[in-house]
Amino acid sequence: MTATFDNIRLIGPPTADGEYVALSEHETIHLHDYPRIYAVPGLYEHIVQERLQCRSPQVAAEGFLRAITRLAMEPSSMTVLDVGSGTGLVGELVRGGGVARVVGVDALAEARAACLRDRPGVYADYLIGDLSSDSGTLPTQLRGYALGGLISAGAFGGTHAPPSALINALSVLPAGAPLAITIDERWMDGSDPDGFGAAIEQLVAQGALTLLERERFLHRITTTGEPIFYELILATTGG
């Protein structure tokens, strides 16, 4: 795998529109061109996990397993929802930690295809859909899985899923269900009424969430080596 990706170069943001990856002399793509990246087995892991040192999957999975231990829950009897499943890294980690079943969901069909190709058998099911829409059928579908927890590594915030997606995801969980999510700290500013910080504070005030931990950590580095920090949120759903 290393030899296959020897010529890949990371390119810093030359303009305001983000980070780039030169796959070859003739092809340069945006770092978030997920359909293109997912099309090549192992490419996402090489770029994001290895080169950019992304830690969110590990931090989210370890946090979730820590939460269920703290709550004296038995992972071997749990079905957990993984929001923004991508190629299945998080699902693989929590399954490795003893969780019986993981149901994946992602907005991109290419993510599901890559996961089924590279990590077959990790998910009990993998759905394609958008949790941010209040009119969608995805929450109804998810209620059929008797979910007992939620995990998400970097799927909420920014150009990804808005606070409404988190609220819709919480709606499919029973009271007392553990959750572990990682969110870019830029979207956790409580002074932004439309941000995740304000949304989480409101959910806590309403009794919809009980916080267990909130921790800042190094999510990854940029293509030019600068740090990007996220927050890990561990909580349980209210009743």
Predicted regions and their residues:
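Class I S-adenosyl-L-methionine
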Residues: 205-239
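A short acidic, Gly/Pro-enriched loop at the edge of an enzyme's catalytic core
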Residues: 137-150
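A short glycine-rich, Lys/Arg-flanked "PGG" loop and its adjoining helix->strand segment in the class I
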Residues: 164-175
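Conserved beta-strand signature within the Rossmann-like core of class I S-adenosyl-L-methionine
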Residues: 176-184
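Conserved alpha-helix/loop element of class I SAM-dependent methyltransferases that forms part
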Residues: 54-76
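N-terminal auxiliary segments of SAM/dcSAM-dependent transferases
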Residues: 1-31
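Class I SAM-dependent methyltransferase SAM/SAH-binding core
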Residues: 81, 88-138
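A short SAM/SAH-binding and catalytic strip from SAM-dependent methyltransferases
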Residues: 147-162
